[in-house]
């Protein structure tokens, strides 16, 4: 499992899980078959990258001293990221987007000194009006 996100749905008795795995069709089919054997599983849907909206969220704590603070803020603006906490020598940046966008932002912030970061893992939803029940 590369990432796992879980949240309550509009029905408080049901949770939705997004499980991200890497593998060929055989591996994916095996995972789907094993999950479908679980009594608690209501439905399983494979989300294809091109037909779904996939996002990840990250919080990144970065050293922000002197003139670097303004550059970090500008970099965040380019990525539509938000500064959610400001300390004397650091800021915490919140970014949401594709895996590639998050990784690019982290790479650009590295020269300033990343103190720590955490990512949610992908969550996804198919595009269009069809819903998963």
Which residues fall in each region the model found?
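Long, contiguous binding/interaction regions
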Residues: 1-16, 20-133
């Amino acid at each position: 499992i590369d990432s796992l996100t879980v949240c309550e749905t509009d029905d408080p008795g049901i949770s939705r899980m997004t499980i991200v795995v890497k593998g060929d069709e055989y591996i994916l089919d095996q995972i789907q078959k094993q999950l479908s054997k679980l009594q608690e599983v209501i439905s399983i849907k494979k989300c294809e990258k091109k037909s779904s909206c996939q996002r990840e969220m990250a919080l990144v704590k970065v050293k922000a001293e002197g003139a670097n603070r303004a550059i970090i803020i500008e970099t965040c603006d380019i990525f539509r990221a938000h500064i959610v906490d400001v300390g004397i020598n650091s800021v915490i940046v919140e970014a949401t987007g594709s895996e590639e966008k998050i990784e690019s932002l982290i790479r650009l912030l590295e020269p300033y000194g990343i103190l720590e970061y955490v990512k949610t893992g992908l969550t996804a939803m198919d595009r269009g009006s069809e819903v998963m029940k």
